[in-house]
């Protein structure tokens, strides 16, 4: 009875027993009753709750006192969709898409809802978004046809969401038609920046929680982000079809209240797999998501009707014009748009003013959210920070592909196409604005608050397969950075690998996804060096008040070169794991990954929370992979902002045939230098091709050799033709051979050729 009363939109319902006529609550019967089935309609929303046991299909409802007991039977709870009624509170709009798009400007802000879907990894965001799109008629076909919002090839191959995707939906509710912009976001911690950008276009978030897994690390991260931005939060429990008993649901509800302070009465229960609870969720979005606000009006003289200059009507309309203000959320080119691209050679539709767009390689499509004013084709748009001016060639919404419309007004999220642009002008977070008349100036325009600058967590060198292709690689990286602005780029030179780029990422998975997108979208095969973290140092002359400076293998300075101390990034890592794996993970974290345990807490009967202070380098080196593999994917790992602490660091240089290989240099703690150097030279020894002379391999810390191996030379049997005689004849041949090899070695100092396969194997050894 206690749990039933607290379920959102289910009500306080009792069933009449068919045997004795008493009243009883069917939900609280997980311990014994073998109810054939029960169904009860929510008096407020029309949802029907269904419970079935053991596959029985009877229709009689009896109280627990008239049913046999069975401790081995567990109830399965689902929320079924409402039966169709004439007075349904809302229904999907049946008009054609063209009519709705043509009338898009007639939607007042009060009839617009912008909502983002956020959750931990694998809590059902993409699947639920796909079901909502199909329920509102945007997509056709079964849900099993594939997740629509995962457009990129790498997303479909890996089964994870990498890019946020937006889609506009139309639905009727209470006699009014609403425009709903749904934003599906990634769940992995490496793409947190993508989430923070996407929610800027929303007034609320759907905070999804897998009812079986409960509150996870990223759930709390998204919750605090929504609070910081002042967004409304609608908690949604997913995968209700997997619930075996009410204890699981009750525990998840209690955890939600304790962790977030959200009331369990606010929770919406859904099952995307069974398409249940979808109508209740849509109703909650309409009723509980705030509508956007902003100044309404035309924003450019091109939007005015053809009136004589100076006429009374024109003067009156110009007086009512308001400057456009919009924020740039994302941008992409033809190659990296995931299919969201309209060839600019085609003529825009009548809705966009029949603007002829010329084919141009510098065409950019931007996703924008309109704060004030109106955005149409031919609008002269100014970029606030770059101070450049461009003309909008086409505007529209994503429904589910790029659909041109007459305009984008206050509260709408849509796209705008620009041609002949400088791609570096369109930075994410840029404010787009207009000055419709002379009374408006740039000083009077308040820029939309941009996004916080993100700092890379790991760095890696990207080198093309062939050195002469570095220009193509740089072009591909710049195009992809428009769609993934969290990546930083610096030029890089290596004696062994040639010219390349040093890229900064938010995590190892982020790096892997970027590499795969370079191959799938641009055909760029690259050699990637092992990821390294950003170290820092403090100058001795500057004192403790001077901020530390970045340090890498390329900018390394020793203590005698004016360095006061080195600093290493540390994080607080939080692991939520099934209890059976907690002991193994805890032991490995402290033994092999320099983790210092801060907390160990039992969350419930099945899960344990572990918290460590750990160097970021050790987490990158393999702790995340170890946790996932050891727990078979059931554990989650989250870490907070970086904190730099003093550390005893050294640079390990690898010398092959007296030549330093900069691509294999690595920074590590002093006590780990011998083992790191030994792994690298051992890998080189096993992969290098033998030659006619010995190849010495050394690992150096400064001038001190901490590890050494030798690739032995092939030896020709120079005494093969000497079958008799004194031993001195053979010794003379051996001495001549030794002197000849010494002369060859002097001529080939630093001349050993290292194939990329050899370097890749050695680089992999640095990450072990």
Curated annotation (Swiss-Prot):
Its EC number is 3.6.5.-. CDD domains: EF4_III, LepA, lepA_C. Its main location: mitochondrion. It catalyses: GTP + H2O = GDP + phosphate + H(+). Residues 110-293 form the tr-type G domain. It is an enzyme of class 3 (hydrolase). It is found in: Mitochondrion inner membrane. InterPro entries: EF-4, EFG_III/V, EFG_V-like, LepA_C_sf, LepA_CTD, LepA_IV, P-loop_NTPase, Small_GTP-bd. GTP binds at residues 119-126, 184-188, 238-241. Residues 1-29 form a transit peptide. Pfam families: EFG_C, GTP_EFTU, LepA_C. GO terms for biological process: positive regulation of translation; translation. It comes from the Eukaryota. GO terms for cellular component: kinetoplast; mitochondrial inner membrane; mitochondrial matrix; mitochondrion. It is a peripheral membrane protein. Promotes mitochondrial protein synthesis. May act as a fidelity factor of the translation reaction, by catalyzing a one-codon backward translocation of tRNAs on improperly translocated ribosomes. Binds to mitochondrial ribosomes in a GTP-dependent manner. Belongs to the TRAFAC class translation factor GTPase superfamily. Classic translation factor GTPase family. LepA subfamily. This is Translation factor GUF1 homolog, mitochondrial. It comes from Trypanosoma brucei brucei (strain 927/4 GUTat10.1). The lineage of its organism: Eukaryota, Discoba, Euglenozoa, Kinetoplastea, Metakinetoplastina.
